[in-house]
């Protein structure tokens, strides 16, 4: 038996793992306008198009400033990447329309950002603190869960 077939071998119990069946649905490609928050704009797209959940397929653009949270030995910290013109290198994660009204369904988007000095930073995008600089183009794909 390997670690994949024996969930307890890596210290995770079944209460920490959730498996679900589903399929991909519609694709939305959108332009996020200057000074719109990236996380909030993606959640609003889900709401506008009636998508409960979506995965990020691609994000291209830059931010006024970047703010990422990350876990450290002494808890969660935040890092501010000074702009303007912080480049988005990669964004991945799941967007949840319910996150706009329900904190129990948080959107979790991780990103790699490049500062104006070329340094690269990674972490979770902080809601309300990552504003589009000029524009951001984003592609989301709906995830539809299947009933058990």
Regions found by a protein language model. Name each.
Residues 2-57, 64-148:
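N-terminal intrinsically disordered, cationic/polar leader segments
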